[in-house]
Structures are given as C-alpha cells and as structure tokens.
C-alpha cells in the first residue's frame, strides 16, 4: 500500500469525522470517499479508533513539536538572564497552531471542526486519547506561566 493510499484514508476520515462525528461515521463511508477497500484501512490503521488517533497525530504532533521548539528557545534566553514574558509564552503556544491550520488549507478548517467535535464526543476513551496528545506540551508550558 502506498503512502498516497494512507493519506487518502486520513483525508477522508478527517472530513467525515468532522462533518458527522466519530460515532456516525462508518468505515464503509471512509473507504468510499478514499476510494480504497476495507483491507487497506485495516492494514494501515487496524481499527476506526486507531484511524482517528492517526488523524489527530498527523496534525497535532508537528504543531506540538514547534510549540516545544519555541518554548525551548524562550527557556534558553531565560538561562541567559532574559525574563520570559507572558506574551511570548502565549505566542509560542498559539502561533504554531494558527500557522499549521493556515498551512493545511481546506483540510485545516476540517481539522478545526473535528477538534470542536471531539470536545463534545461522548466516548471517553476517544476524548482521553485526544487529550493525551496535548498533555506533554501542557506539562512543559504550565510551569513557565
């Protein structure tokens, strides 16, 4: 299976999960939009839950990496005696997300819609998996505030 196949599955899932929610989206719908068979989804992701996690990881991991890079820079400046300003910490947290959503194009809007849906999902396991992606970043940012 090609990387393009995996990306088509992720794009299809992201859009459908954003529009209909996790529970209301079937793997059959995802395979139809992605133009792949069910075996391809199972091969790449194993389950619908793992697919949702991959959708989030694809967008959140690079954003979090950039957040931490910016925070590292602020902490390095602080080690040299420069005071860390609250504005700089907030910018280090928010700017990577804004830049990423803008860079994702139309898929960025879908992803933000999906993030909003995740906050109203009733499946606690999914909510916990989603929030777990942000926990390491939160643990680094909170002490600096």
Language-model regions: role of each:
Residues 3-11, 45-72, 131:
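An amphipathic alpha-helix adjacent to DNA-recognition modules
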Residues 8, 16, 20-50, 54-55:
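Helix-turn-helix
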Residues 16, 62, 100, 144:
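Short alpha-helical functional segments enriched in proximate histidine and acidic residues
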Residues 69-108:
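Hydrophobic alpha-helical connector segments
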Residues 88, 110, 123-145:
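Amphipathic alpha-helical packing segments from all-alpha helical-bundle domains
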Residues 93, 97, 112-119:
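Short alpha-helical scaffolding segments that buttress acidic/His motifs in well-ordered protein cores
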Residues 99-103, 117-128:
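Amphipathic C-terminal alpha-helical segment
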